[in-house]
């Protein structure tokens, strides 16, 4: 491992020391809590939607979340190790066969739905 990779790994450890990032994949419905600064006030804003892309690039890792707000599709890109991310919660696992779900941009209504991954629930039941 070269020096730059080593520094990146140390920085990732420092940034994730006080928070846990759950494993998630494209197709999952997530709730991302973001720290928003408005003037001198700081508050947490929840952003819930479907992960349509995930980019794993070490410290530069990011993911795109898409939601429908007032009938209009809204996408937001989040940096995975950003200090502005308060937390990420996986609400529902999606069963998809693609790594990038950009085709959801052209779809609306029932055709934009994603099937739920059932094997995720079976493992929880088997563990109990």
Swiss-Prot record:
Keywords: Ribonucleoprotein, Ribosomal protein. Gene3D superfamilies: 2.30.30.790. One of its GO terms (molecular function) is structural constituent of ribosome. It holds the Pfam family Ribosomal_L19. GO terms for biological process: translation. It comes from the Bacteria. This protein is located at the 30S-50S ribosomal subunit interface and may play a role in the structure and function of the aminoacyl-tRNA binding site. Belongs to the bacterial ribosomal protein bL19 family. This is Large ribosomal subunit protein bL19.
